[in-house]
Amino acid sequence: MSDSEEESQDRQLKIVVLGDGASGKTSLATCFAQETFGKRYKQTIGLDFFLRRITLPGNLNVTLQIWDIGGQTIGGKMLDKYIYGAQGVLLVYDITNYQSFENLEDWYTVVKKVSEESETRPLVALVGNKIDLEHMRTIKPEKHLRFCQENGFSSHFVSAKTGDSVFLCFQKVAAEILGIKLNKAEIEQSQRVVKADIVNYNQEPMSRTVNPPRSSMCAVQ
């Protein structure tokens, strides 16, 4: 088999992760791409990139190129350029932070603007993060689901800290983009649990990095 024939069996998808700062976007991307969870909050300045190759049913290899967009980018001139060409968009909010959910309207407005200008519509997924803090939830699941129904989003609830449904979220998004259906066994196999230490968020902005702190801990069960 030639190199070109081998490459034809691989797909690459651009997935853009949007949402307010401290909603857990970087932790989500890191948990998926590196199966780790950083113990300290590091503000993303501009954007970070993550890559992970997964295999979907039919032995289809898919490389997900994750664009983690900084929360302060919402008013910047580069945001539309970051979104351009994306096959998938994750709108991420913190289920314990009501404002992070409300602000998704602004993020989605930019996505719609870029989609209209490029005449392409990416798959958009609404992702409620930090479900390990269910007792502190401020956004009811019904409100989350209503927002999905009104805009045609796919719906996901995850915890970047425990790893709950993180891989499944990205797997489902990739499969939906490519028109592939996952069966029940594949979905159950993808629901991973990651052990992590308690996080103390540092409110001081820090320079961005794609490498997890050395003291981070993560174990996939």
Curated annotation (Swiss-Prot):
GO annotations of cellular component type: ciliary basal body; ciliary rootlet; cytoplasm; plasma membrane
Region (Switch II): 68-85
Cellular compartment(s): Cell membrane; Cytoplasm, Cytoskeleton, Cilium basal body; Cytoplasm; Nucleus
Family annotation (InterPro entries): P-loop_NTPase, Small_GTP-bd, Small_GTPase
Keyword GTP-binding applies: yes
Cofactors (names): Mg(2+)
Keyword set, alphabetical order: Acetylation, Cell membrane, Cell projection, Cytoplasm, Cytoskeleton, GTP-binding, Hydrolase, Lipoprotein, Magnesium, Membrane, Metal-binding, Methylation, Nucleotide-binding, Nucleus, Phosphoprotein, Prenylation
Stated family: Belongs to the small GTPase superfamily. Rab family.
Protein name (record): Ras-related protein Rab-28
Organism: Pongo abelii
